[in-house]
Amino acid sequence: DKTNYNKKLITSDALVWTFRNNKSVVKNPEMYGWTKLDKVGQVSRVSCKVPISDTPIKDHAITGSFSFRKAEHFLEYCDKTIFKNRRINNEFYLDIVLDECVIGGLNVQPFEVDEYNSWGTPLDLENYLKK
């Protein structure tokens, strides 16, 4: 909801939009980015294409959307990701930019959505259209 979003954004440096309890992640957890949370619910690590546990359906998977309170943070940590050449499968991913934000000490919070529809594969789209 918009109120929760605005509150979280003004109290953090960046938001990682996440979802949980979606069966699509069980079939192929290597298709997703993942966030590990600390005891107070702040993002302590972001993993790209590598699940963070043996129970991915319970973990915060990344929707692919991110919010930054300041554009400067986004640009700075994109540059750091590129400078460090942090590629996955020879490509740069925004998930890793958020991991760099965590490493850099920024306050990165999850913003969990109630529902997520994955269209990452033709089968995902076909299953969605059957709903």
Regions found by a protein language model. Name each.
Residues 7, 42-117, 123-124, 130:
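Catalytic-core segments of class I nucleotidyltransferases/pyrophosphorylases
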Residues 1-37:
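Conserved beta-loop-beta/alpha segment of the NTase-like Rossmann-fold superfamily
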Residues 24, 117-118:
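Alpha-helix N-cap/loop-to-helix initiation residues
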Residues 29-36, 123-131:
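Hydrophobic transmembrane alpha-helix bundles
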